[in-house]
Amino acid sequence: MDTNFKLSNCIGTVYRDGQVAFSKDGYSVISPIGNKLSIFDLRNNTSKTLDIDCNYNIKRLSISPSGYHLLASDERGVVHFVHLLSEFKIYTFRSNKPIGSLQWSPDATRVAICRENDLQIHEFGKSIENKVYNPFSLSRTYKLSSDSLKTIDWSDDANLLVSGGEDRVVRVVGAKDFKNLFIHPLASHKGYIVNCQFMKNSYDMITVCKRGLANVWTCNLRPGELVEGIWKKDEEGSDDIEMLEDGEQKVEKIFFEKTKKYWLSESSGSGKSVDVTAARFHKETNILATAFNNGVIVLHEIPSFALVHNLRVSEMRIQTVAWNLTGDWLAIGCGKGSTAQLVVWEWQSESYVMKQQAHSLRITTAEYSPDGSLMATGAEDGKVKIWNSRSSFCTVTFDEHTSGVTAVKWTQSGRAILSASLDGTVRAHDLKRYRNFRTLVCPEPTQLATLAVDKAGDLVIAGAKEVFNIYIWSFETGHLLDILSGHESAISSIDIHGNHIVSGSWDRTIKMWTIVDSQAETVEVSHEALDVKFSPAGDEIAVLTSDGVITFFEAKEMINLGSIDTKLDTDPARGSRDTITRQSAAKTKTFTRIRFSPDGNLLLAGGESNNFCLYSVPERMILKKWQITANRSLDGVILDFNRRNFTEFGNMQLVDTSDEEDELEPNNKMSIKLPGTKNFDLGERRARPEVNIYEVTYCPTGRRFAICSTEGVSVYSLDTISMFDPFQLDSQTNAEVIKRAVWNNDYSTAIMASLRLNNAQYITECLESTSISQIPLVASSLPLMYAERLLKWMVEGNVMSSTRHVHFYMIWLRAILQHHGMQLKGRADVATLTGIQQIVAHHQQHITKLANQNKFALNWLVKIRQSKKSVKKEEEEEEDVSDESDDEDIEDESAGSDDEDSDDSVEIIE
């Protein structure tokens, strides 16, 4: 029983706040989502999430010129050094102050960090003190301003740095000691410095301020003209050229001349009433991208400031922009919190490469499709979104509900999704035409809180929140068939298996209903029932009560089979607004959701806590416990708040004691939740939403499960591939053995050795080196253990889903299943076979789509050719007709002329 589930992705969250960046190849966007990082591969249409365990929200990013390393800083000034290939955090160091910006040098040997009001330069990979790994060593610090610094940039030769911030002054400093300059200030702006960058292979600069003023500065020195040494201040009346003792002119001091000024806000469409929120200059194409707080982004060519493009991306404020390597794509982060969206725009073709937006309010429910390829989510904003499980991109959004969505369910065929809402309706949406084709309405206005669909797809069951009734509709006709009443309090959960419906209520009872005769068997429980679920086989029922106890009943006779006490596993934290002790607060919090695994041996539980647990059903014991997040920017992560923050006036964390008046951050004051409220704007920068789990769901393959929490939908999977995970490895298995076996055409030995190393590159080479004629022979010679391992590798890896050799791998699959199918049927994990089915369905969908497009294109070409032929034929016929008419006219004319001649001859005779 494998329980090594690891975080693989976050669905429903694409961008929260902070800086976005492109990868070195320019095809992937790295976006911060809270204390994690999501990488969106735009070329392969996939995404993944790096869980680097930051304690606070990530704000600033910088990728090394090699593309292998990433620096990420959080709200508290902690810098995380991440290796992107292994997706592992290597090192962490504290700057002890908030970081406004950080950037690698072009030669990747130094890192510049704007640490509040000073600039630090760290050398990379030179310091190992006391045999302790320390990749960054501080080389120099510049005290530049009394206000915070916001932006920084290196020159292409890595000798100069330019920085600007809230004091409206741009300063140029040297990365080393130069005789030409020390700190050179440039003051010519009306607002905060939003961006300042050097131009390509030059010391010329462009600077942009918040008020929309852009300046182009020309430097008197070129790269290579800086002289190392100690800078000395010139005396009054002296020239800018330093004289050596022998009288030779040697060093020329640096200065900048403002050669161009332009008001960027004139291109925003709203005049000077809008402010610049982000700007980025692409050095290769000399194009400046400027974003405003009204959602408009404009492109100008530098230094002429010719308007290239103007686009309104969103109605929300644009937080960040980033260019890719070639300057073709522009990544744009809009909004904050749960209302944020991420856009990748190709400005030359004026088209969206990617445009994703999460739910605007918290996600309350999620459900996998029967084949596990899609996931449906419902939120309090009344929208239902369908996400692709493999790419984590939203494919369609349904917004017909007028109130919050409480439950979503798939039909067994996976062609329709049903959603229950607080508006009192159940809506069915077709995933082929993307329309709401049926609406089920209650006979009286009430709020629906639960939903269930039978496997045949004939019945739809929903539980009311106010009138304590269960409604049964016919899915085919939409007619109300029956109303089940009997509960005396709110119905918390319902589930269906076969002809039986089980319901749990706050009246401390669970009822087993028979659909045929509408009769119910009532079983009393010790506390309020919060959730109730059938096992996949239908022979067992699990009931979660408010005291944290999961009780198991035999489905037919309702006999108590045992229980699991989860109270100690909940381990809830004390909220910053709680006025009682942590022990007293823990008594009111418990798990609220449970879900069986597809094989029925595991039970997943989560609720009013930062923790969720996996239990063994046969053993009635806990197997593993996870923490949903370590983000201390959220409330409920730390078990108890710091006593030093608790005074006679209460918790000082709830009091805004700062004197910060950041004009770039509107509504910058502390957001305090009103008494009795559960929801508030999660986009508030200083708000601390409380961590809770609203839903847990298992993928039908059994290799993934999803957790709906305050941070979105977190997907945990067994298919996360580590860099080195060998299988039955011995000392004689190495790369040379594999290469030698492939060279000798011993493909079965090579495949078994590569499977023992579990190296994806070697396995792919061995498989693709095998000729098609020998695939059946090699597949039959593989032992059953290695055949099963090969199938598992195909499911877990990305080779099968992204390969171009689809037919080749289908031949491999057919050969393995033909020779080992009977043994695998009783031996292999069901999840492996289900994963193979998903991969085949994935390729079938893409090939069918491509074939249909080609077929339609060919039909169109044939029709065009036929129409051209018919037009040409008609033209030829018209020409023939015209030729015949011309011939007739000629004959008539000739006949007429003959008559005239005969008449003339007669007259002459006469």
From Swiss-Prot:
Residues 867-910 are annotated as: Disordered. GO terms for biological process: maturation of SSU-rRNA from tricistronic rRNA transcript (SSU-rRNA, 5.8S rRNA, LSU-rRNA); ribosomal small subunit assembly. The keyword Glycosyltransferase does not apply. The keyword Repeat applies. Residues 875-910 have a biased composition (Acidic residues). GO terms for cellular component: Pwp2p-containing subcomplex of 90S preribosome; small-subunit processome. SUPFAM superfamilies: WD40 repeat-like, YVTN repeat-like/Quinoprotein amine dehydrogenase. Pfam families: Utp12, WD40. WD repeats lie at residues 12-50, 53-92, 94-134, 144-183, 188-227, 271-310, 313-355, 358-397, 400-439, 443-485, 486-523, 525-563, 586-625, 688-728. Gene3D superfamilies: YVTN repeat-like/Quinoprotein amine dehydrogenase. It comes from the Eukaryota. Keywords: Repeat, WD repeat. PANTHER family: PERIODIC TRYPTOPHAN PROTEIN 2 HOMOLOG, WD40 REPEAT PROTEIN. Belongs to the WD repeat PWP2 family. This is Periodic tryptophan protein 2 homolog. It comes from Caenorhabditis elegans. The lineage of its organism: Eukaryota, Metazoa, Ecdysozoa, Nematoda, Chromadorea.
